[in-house]
């Protein structure tokens, strides 16, 4: 081996493949005890070596643990691991996916600002953008057709601060055309935030296609076992918030809570940290500090356990989802299968570009000529599938979105995202495929 070759380590894992980094990135054996597994640091606070060190940490002159509301060593390992898997410079693990989405937006936009978003998003995100953020003075324009790039261009205003979309939306299962949308965002001087929950970085890394910030509900496939709530923001470090001080004043004006610190100048691309950390550190030391959506060390640990098998689980999820989708397509009682992995999908070709290993394991289908009541009966007949609001579990899951996860939307809004009364959503698990198909047949038997 050449002396010039950098040997990968947990602290610098760039030379390792994805499957290795999901296990090792960010964590070496515990220096004090030699513990091989990640310790759970179940503590509220951390002892400072000196009064000077304490002062430096509070002033952000030195990075290190202060209080578990802001960071914790267990949490930090998982943040570094997810940042490595997504290709970002840093990450912030939070109490839920909804907290991650909220912080990702509020870190940039405030009262009087404007967001351009795809309408094809999770129901909770749609509500956040349309109602809750509107209460805070942030207006969102949802493009009618996220595949129409001209609509993204036309929606931009002088006060637009960011674009937002989901890589593979739940439950419409279209595929966001990240590269041209990112280009339009950058032409207008704003970042693109992409929710990558459904595919995970094993199937798609939005930063490689131009996204600036990636968010996840870590509750789903990153954790993978339906045990722990969490969310994460990953920053690419590529967007320079200091390039337009007028558009991003919160990054370019002195922060009153930190004695004049200027995020873009002091933590940005030319800072002493060697990377543009202005976005991710601002989210931590301002939003998280002040509003407190902190993840518990135990939940961070559980999500880390899930990450260790991410690639193996996703491969099995995709294998089963592919078989379920083709089985459904061959069923005369099915009107339409909604999944970008089947050739009948309008987004099949785009999925081949962005997601060659598969578009995730969340799929939907409509029952031919079924009423809302018959569709609910279908769901109730299943025994192996769990009727839950979650996705991303090793277990196979089912739900009727029109009366549950998306019930807050109007009939017109439901139609726009493809949630019809006869629509069923599946999150295909990793059980034996024969058992999954046999259980789905129980539902079809109720229609006969």
Regions found by a protein language model. Give the residues of each.
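N-terminal glycine-rich, Lys/His-bearing helix-loop that initiates the first secondary-structure elements
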Residues: 1-65
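Conserved PLP-enzyme active-site core in the AAT-like
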Residues: 6-13, 22-24, 28-31, 91-330
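Conserved C-terminal alpha-helix-loop-beta "cap" of PLP-dependent enzymes
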Residues: 292, 314, 322, 326-329, ...
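Short loop segments at secondary-structure junctions
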Residues: 45, 236-239, 367-370
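Pocket-edge structural micro-motifs
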Residues: 27, 42-46, 69-71, 95, ...
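Conserved N-terminal alpha-helix of the aminotransferase class I/II PLP-enzyme fold
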Residues: 45, 50-102, 124-132
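PLP-dependent enzyme catalytic core of the Aspartate aminotransferase-like
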Residues: 2-6, 130-131, 139-140, 154, ...
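Short amphipathic alpha-helical segments
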Residues: 63, 89, 299-303, 308, ...
């Amino acid at each position: 081996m050449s002396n010039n070759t950098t040997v990968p380590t947990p602290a610098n894992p760039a030379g390792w493949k994805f499957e290795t980094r999901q296990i090792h990135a960010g964590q070496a054996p515990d220096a004090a005890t030699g513990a091989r597994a990640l310790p759970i640091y179940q503590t509220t606070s951390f002892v400072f070596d000196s009064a000077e060190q304490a002062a430096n940490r509070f002033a952000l002159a030195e990075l290190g643990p202060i209080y578990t509301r802001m960071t914790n060593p267990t949490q930090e390992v998982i943040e570094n691991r997810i940042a490595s898997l997504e290709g970002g410079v840093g990450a912030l693990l939070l109490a839920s996916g909804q907290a991650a989405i909220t912080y990702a937006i509020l870190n940039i936009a405030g009262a009087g600002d404007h967001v351009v978003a795809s309408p094809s998003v999770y129901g909770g995100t749609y509500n956040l953008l349309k109602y809750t953020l509107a209460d805070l003075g942030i207006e969102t324009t949802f493009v009618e057709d996220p595949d129409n790039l001209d609509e993204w261009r036309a929606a931009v205003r002088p006060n637009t601060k960011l674009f937002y979309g989901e890589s593979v939306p739940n439950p419409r299962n279209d595929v966001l055309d990240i590269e041209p949308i990112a280009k339009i965002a950058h032409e207008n001087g704003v970042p693109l935030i992409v929710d990558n929950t459904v595919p995970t970085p094993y199937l798609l890394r939005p930063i490689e296609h131009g996204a600036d910030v990636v968010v996840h509900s870590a509750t789903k496939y990153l954790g993978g076992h339906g045990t722990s709530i969490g969310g994460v923001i990953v920053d690419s470090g590529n967007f320079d918030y200091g390039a337009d001080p007028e558009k991003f004043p919160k990054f370019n004006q002195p922060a009153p809570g930190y004695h004049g610190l200027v995020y873009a100048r002091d933590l940005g691309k030319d800072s002493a940290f060697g990377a543009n950390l202005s976005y991710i550190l601002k989210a931590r030391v301002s939003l998280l500090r002040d509003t407190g959506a902190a993840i518990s060390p135990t939940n961070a640990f559980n999500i880390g356990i899930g990450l260790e098998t991410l690639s193996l689980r996703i491969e099995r999820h995709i294998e089963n989802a592919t078989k379920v989708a083709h089985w459904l397509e061959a069923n005369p009682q099915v009107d339409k299968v909604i999944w970008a992995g089947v050739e009948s999908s309008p987004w099949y070709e785009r999925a081949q570009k962005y997601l060659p290993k598969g578009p995730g394991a969340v799929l939907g289908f409509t029952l031919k000529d079924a009423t809302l009541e018959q569709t609910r009966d279908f769901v109730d007949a299943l025994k192996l599938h769990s009727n839950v609001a979650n996705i991303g579990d090793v277990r196979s899951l089912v739900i009727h979105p029109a009366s549950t996860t998306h019930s807050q939307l109007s009939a017109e809004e439901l139609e726009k995202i493809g949630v019809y009364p006869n629509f069923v959503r599946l999150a295909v698990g990793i059980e034996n495929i024969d058992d999954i198909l046999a259980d789905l047949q129980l539902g079809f038997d109720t229609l006969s």
